[in-house]
Every structure is written in structure tokens, then in C-alpha cells.
Swiss-Prot record:
Keywords: ATP-binding, Ligase, Nucleotide-binding, Protein biosynthesis. GO terms for biological process: amino acid metabolic process; regulation of translational fidelity; translation. Belongs to the asparaginase 1 family. GatD subfamily. Residues 92-422 form the Asparaginase/glutaminase domain. InterPro entries: AsnA_fam, Asp/glu_Ase-like_sf, Asparaginase/glutaminase-like, Asparaginase/glutaminase_AS1, Asparaginase/glutaminase_AS2, Asparaginase_C, GatD, GatD_N. Its EC number is 6.3.5.-. The keyword Amino-acid biosynthesis does not apply. It catalyses: L-glutamyl-tRNA(Gln) + L-glutamine + ATP + H2O = L-glutaminyl-tRNA(Gln) + L-glutamate + ADP + phosphate + H(+). GO terms for molecular function: asparaginase activity; ATP binding; glutaminyl-tRNA synthase (glutamine-hydrolyzing) activity. The keyword Protein biosynthesis applies. This is Glutamyl-tRNA(Gln) amidotransferase subunit D. It comes from the Archaea. Gene3D superfamilies: 2.30.30.520, 3.40.50.40, L-asparaginase, N-terminal domain.
């Protein structure tokens, strides 16, 4: 039996508050919560119940012994948000570009429903506070998981951002899944030339139907940062585990450093640009950010997609490098050990790659610190083989940058010059010890 049939037979509706008794390990266990609508990936014979603590559980229909309705779903009168949506004179205009995820959705605990938010009215229902900061214009560009994001999506986002900024918007927010947000932030940092206004990427670590969700505060802070004087690509996410402030990170220096913590995003080898409080207070943590200007944004979207990111590990085979060369890859970014090393027995394959015109760049899997190939003999051999040391660039940033560089030239000397040119703050001029694990 399917969930819809099960509920219909018992005159139970989505949003009803129920008590379910089920069999579990030979004993009866009772749960109370709201009946949730089935979603795309849920099993047809599993009932989803939202507990009062905000978490969802799935209960197989065959395990249910009793179900009773404690309270019927409340039917709310239709609420309109025209006043918010129409905007207020004098407020700046900010476009929010949606690419996927649940950053702007909110649970209605009286009905059990989750509101996805990407029309203006849905955004007003979910996070009305942002309409007090700016006249918000939402646009859903596409709706994909961030792990499915490809370079072609970066290009589309870049063009949509430039279109909004060049049409008069004060700033742009890009709502994005967190898993690959750092890659997209780096790509936009290189593609958006002459940037004169803020571009803010924002996501949520906790889904919006959980009481610990960070979605609303992140979105509020991101809109506030989009109206600031900072003309850079930034990532705005929780600055610590509580709901006190968010941090604005430079798009080329930010990395997701935890699978689930709300403050998972950190600036690496650098300090964040600013702290943002939901009430509008902004504390700038550095002065060397690009300032707002009237320049027209240009999109430089020439990229070479045949670039690989390879992590060194004990026992790595030179066949991996050979395979990439034989398959026509134009660039390889290596996450080396320590200061930027590889086993000696794969250096001949790296040398062959360079001889055949493949750009090989070195980063460190330590994440913190700087590549230095002059300290040990292995590093000096890699330099002699033609490897380009990427200073303190994040591996993900170096990967995106090499794509962008190879889109402009495949002359290895020119590639070297461009990889070592600091275009968007991706290279810190000196090693900062005060940024380690902060």
C-alpha cells in the first residue's frame, strides 16, 4: 500500500498532528508529529513524520500498529505580501539568483509544510527581513544540487550576475548549495572583470525545516553585504555555531572545512573581509578590499575544461598522470604532500606531461601554508621538470584558475606568468601565521 492510499483510508491529511504507534525490535514505540508530504526520493510505502523537535523520521507502513489524529491541520487564510514585494522608495535593488538548495525555505510547524522560496512572495513568506534591507528581485536560474554543478553553470551564473549589475542593481546574491560553493566563488572571482559591486554567494548547512537551520540568518546577512561598499565576490555564512554573526570570506580564499557545522566555511591563509550581524552592523576585518565603483562588469568566460585535480597519496601510480596526458588533458593541478611534493617515481611522468605541453601546477594538501619547492631535493626535481608552484592558493582555487588561464593561453611560459599573477586575492603576498585554524 502507498502512503497516499494509507492516509485516505483513515481520513488523515498532510499537516495533521498525529500519534503513531509502531513495532520496533519486538516492542511498541510511540511517536508524535506532523504528517509530511512525500518528496521525490522518499519510498512510496514510508510515511514521513516531522517530530516536534523539527527532525523528520520515516516509518514503514507495515510497522504501524495504530495511528490517531490529535489535531487537524490548520487551514490558514491566504496572506499577501504585496507591500513587501513592491519595495520601498530609497532602498537599493538586489537580485537574488537561485541555483538550487533550500537556502530560502521555511517550515510551517502548524501544517508541517515546507515553503520553497524563489518567487518574490515565497521569499517574503520565508525571510521577510530581507525586504527591509533592499528591494529584492528573485530569479531562479536553475535548480540543481551543487555536486552536479559544472563549469558551464559557472559561465551562466557569471553572465546572469553581470546582467543584473550592469542593469543598475546595487548588488547580487547567489543562493548556492554548500558542497561546491567554493569552486563557484573562485570561478566568478576570475570571470567577473572590472567588478564594481558586491557579489555574494550564500547557502545553508542545515536544511530549512530543522530548528537549527542557518538559512534565514545567512540570507539576511548576505543581502546586507550585497548593499555594502565591498566590490568583490564573497561567500557569506555563519561565523560561529550560534546565531550571532556571519563572516564574509573572499571568494578565492574560502573553503568548506566541516561536513555539517554551521560555521563550516573558513578563510584559509587569510582573514575574512568582515563580520556581519543580522541587525545590519558590519565590522570590517581588513581594509584592502576592492571598493564599490561605477565600472561596467565584463564577463571573461574563456575556460579550458580539460583540467584535472589530482591528490598525491602513498602508492600513487604514474599511470594516473600518463592517463590524463594520453586523454588530452591540458592542465593538471596536483595536491602534493607537505611543501608540495610527490613520490620520486612519478616525476618522469610529470616531466613527460610538461614536455607534451600540459601545464602542471603544485598546491599542498595541507591546505594551510605555502608551497615551496626549493627546500628539498624532490621539490627541486619537480621545479626542473617544469612544475608551477602555486604559492598559498587553495587546490580548488588553483584548479579553477588553471581552467581560466588555459582558456586564454596554452603557452606554458604564459601560463606560468598568469598562474603566479594575483588576479582576485587568490595569492597572499606573505604567510600569515595568525590565520591558522581560526
Amino acid at each position: 500500500m502507498r502512503v497516499d492510499e494509507f492516509l485516505k483510508e483513515r481520513n488523515i491529511n498532510v499537516g495533521d498532528f498525529v500519534r503513531i504507534t509502531k513495532e520496533e525490535d519486538g516492542e511498541e514505540v510511540t511517536y508524535e508529529g506532523y504528517i509530511m508530504p512525500p518528496y521525490e526520493l522518499s519510498a512510496g510505502d514510508t510515511l514521513v513524520l516531522k517530530l516536534e523537535n523539527g527532525y523528520n523520521i520515516g516509518i514503514a507502513l507495515e510497522k504501524i500498529r495504530r495511528i490517531e489524529v490529535l489535531e487537524r491541520a490548520k487551514v490558514k487564510p491566504e496572506v499577501h505580501f504585496e507591500a513587501l514585494i513592491e519595495g520601498k522608495p530609497g532602498l537599493p535593488e538586489v537580485t537574488i539568483i537561485g541555483t538550487g538548495g533550500t537556502i530560502a525555505s521555511r517550515i510551517d510547524y502548524e501544517t508541517g509544510a515546507v515553503y520553497p522560496a524563489f518567487t518574490a512572495e515565497e521569499l517574503a513568506k520565508a525571510v521577510p527581513e530581507i525586504f527591509e534591507v533592499a528591494n529584492v528581485k528573485p530569479k531562479l536560474l536553475f535548480n540543481i544540487f551543487s555536486e552536479d554543478m559544472k563549469p558551464k553553470h559557472w559561465v551562466k551564473i557569471a553572465h546572469e550576475v553581470a546582467k543584473a549589475l550592469n542593469s543598475g542593481d546595487y548588488g547580487v546574491v547567489v543562493a548556492h548549495g554548500t558542497d561546491t560553493m567554493g569552486y563557484t566563488a573562485a570561478a566568478l572571482s576570475f570571470m567577473l572583470r572590472n567588478l564594481g559591486k558586491p557579489v555574494v554567494l550564500v547557502g545553508a548547512q542545515r536544511s530549512s525545516d530543522r530548528p537549527s537551520s542557518d538559512a534565514a540568518m545567512n540570507l539576511i546577512c548576505s543581502v546586507r553585504m550585497a548593499t555594502s561598499e565591498v566590490a568583490e565576490v564573497m561567500v557569506v555564512m555563519h561565523g560561529e555555531t550560534g546565531d550571532t554573526y556571519c563572516l564574509a570570506h573572499r571568494g578565492t580564499k574560502v573553503r568548506k572545512m566541516h561536513t555539517s557545522r554551521r560555521d563550516a566555511f573558513r578563510s584559509i591563509n587569510d582573514v575574512p573581509i568582515a563580520k556581519i550581524w543580522p541587525n545590519g552592523e558590519i565590522e570590517f576585518l581588513r581594509k584592502d578590499y576592492r571598493k564599490r565603483s561605477d565600472e561596467e562588469v565584463e564577463v571573461d568566460d574563456k575556460i579550458e575544461e580539460k583540467v584535472a585535480l589530482v591528490k598525491v597519496y602513498p602508492g600513487i601510480s604514474s599511470e594516473i598522470i600518463d592517463f590524463l596526458v594520453d586523454k588530452g588533458y591540458k592542465g593538471i593541478v596536483i595536491e602534493g604532500t607537505g611543501l608540495g611534493h610527490t613520490p620520486n617515481d612519478i616525476i618522469p611522468s610529470i616531466e613527460r606531461a610538461v614536455e607534451e605541453g600540459v601545464a602542471v601546477c603544485m598546491t599542498s594538501q595541507c591546505i594551510y601554508g605555502r608551497v615551496n619547492l626549493n627546500v628539498y631535493s624532490t621539490g627541486r626535481k619537480l621545479l626542473k621538470a617544469g612544475v608551477i608552484p602555486c604559492e598559498d592558493m587553495l587546490p580548488e582555487t588553483a584548479y579553477v584558475k588553471l581552467m581560466w588561464v588555459l582558456g586564454h593561453t596554452q603557452n606554458l611560459e604564459e601560463v606560468r606568468k598568469m598562474m603566479l599573477t594575483n588576479y582576485a586575492g587568490e595569492i597572499t603576498p606573505y604567510t600569515r601565521f595568525d590565520t591558522y585554524l581560526r
